């Protein structure tokens, strides 16, 4: 007749997976019950690995069969599987009420021009506004804001930077931190760290809105910003031509995947009015955006004409909302700022700005 000693001796032949000691020596055998031809075993192991449990179950069952056990009740207890940490909202700029991402699927569509004039138009509404030039590979904001020759200012501790002021807007750009014309040849991690530092190591103070001029595309910079602060709005800048609209769709798709509320689309350079004959020409075509608007449940936030004064203002550091406040484009930026402000109020009321669902998670599990 089978005894507990017989069972223990058989269990001493069961080596714990990936180790050299048996499960009896480890102290994993917690209980043995014998009743007629039935055997009950309670084994407790420190691993939550399903593979480890399966190996032990197979080896123990085989050993007990060889001992003549006909009915085996084998209970292998394991610790709970490690749970991924619950995602939480991350915010490196808690003094800023709203962060707005100005994006484009491609370069050369007027993204920086939009960022500059929108920022000033928001400031003209008596809001505290910051403008962050996150386009580290092509920082045009210093020139467009008339700051290309300005020196950066350190705070008394010498550890943080104070934004420069222009037209009522607090401004910071990588273009202020290295020589004009110097190229940056950075890999993704360096770019990501730079964007985080421009949020945490700049003394922005209490802002109502921070407008962020992004690099073109949908890469590391956009993901880093979205994970670093809850974004209240995403704005895509495009031109009416089909290839630009294709890229605008990618930008809108990025907003959707990163849970960024979409404020709308800015259609830039939609038409040109000749100053001499007053004839209007659609240089880039007049392709409809209705499919984009419907697919992403958004609106055209502004339709800007191709106005020479806009380009001249950017080159001279005199944005059109300042140099020609009564121009067609300036009035459009003014209306755009009002509409964006209303959108941001809705985002705040409905608590739509949250980045907890896009935070990186990492789970560590012991397999032995």
Curated annotation (Swiss-Prot):
Specify the domain of life of the species encoding this protein: Bacteria
* GO biological-process terms attached to the record: iron-sulfur cluster assembly
Example GO molecular function term? ATP-dependent FeS chaperone activity
Q: Which HAMAP family match?
A: Mrp_NBP35
Sum up the protein's function in the record's words.
Answer: Binds and transfers iron-sulfur (Fe-S) clusters to target apoproteins. Can hydrolyze ATP.
Q: Which PANTHER family match?
A: IRON-SULFUR PROTEIN NUBPL
Q: Quaternary arrangement and interactors, per the entry? A: Homodimer.
Q: What is this protein called?
A: Iron-sulfur cluster carrier protein
> Which organism's genome codes for this protein?
Helicobacter pylori (strain ATCC 700392 / 26695)
